[in-house]
Amino acid sequence: MNNIIPTQEEIAARVKALESILIEQNVISTAMVDRMVEIYEEEVGPKLGAKVVAKAWTDSEFKARLLDDATEACKELGISGLQGEDMVVLEDTDDVHHAIVCTLCSCYPWPVLGLPPNWYKEPAYRARIVREPRTVLSEEFNYHLPESTEIRIWDTSSEMRYWVLPQRPEGTEGWSEEQLAELVTRDSMIGVGPVKTPA
């Protein structure tokens, strides 16, 4: 069994091949593909999650509500929908880092993170992140955490969808929510990557 998570290039090549076949067979059109991409890039997905994270970084009362009941707190910002009925947000600290996985399939909080990345659905990721999280984070995602940081893995399911509230980067005091949201990445809300470094 191959335990190596496919590279983004390998995944992209597979997707492109499948897309070409479906277009050639008139199952879908390029306009349909473009529209679906636009929906998940602009109307659903990581940009919305980044908006929630930035709000939590700047509003302690909202952050408390988010950590208490993420589903309801997200609704305050107009964010809800399929695959986001029961969400729990996990706060990263200096001592504890969280990462999410669905060991059974690919359950994922779509309203805030969009479509799951292909690697998230791969059996290798689903098995290895549970057994050897520090190794997977460093070798597969080039994300190196201090040895003193405890890594907790959360198994998301159809009943409960977890996602991560990453730590606010230093040097962002006085930044607007819009500026802060630009630093938040999808991978930081999954727990497999950092937020962007402030410029």
UniProtKB/Swiss-Prot annotation:
Q: Give a Pfam family name.
A: NHase_alpha
Q: How many and how are cofactors bound here?
A: Binds 1 Fe(3+) ion per subunit.
Amino acids binding Fe(3+): 102, 105-107
Q: Which reaction does it catalyse?
A: an aliphatic primary amide = an aliphatic nitrile + H2O
Q: Which residues carry this modification: Cysteine sulfinic acid (-SO2H)?
A: 105
Asked whether the keyword Nuclease is assigned, the reply is: no
**UniProtKB keywords:** Iron, Lyase, Metal-binding, Oxidation
Q: Name one GO molecular function term.
A: transition metal ion binding
Similarity field: Belongs to the nitrile hydratase subunit alpha family.
Subunit-structure text: Heterodimer of an alpha and a beta chain.
Question: Per its record, how is this protein called by name?
Answer: Nitrile hydratase subunit alpha
Organism this protein belongs to: Rhodococcus sp
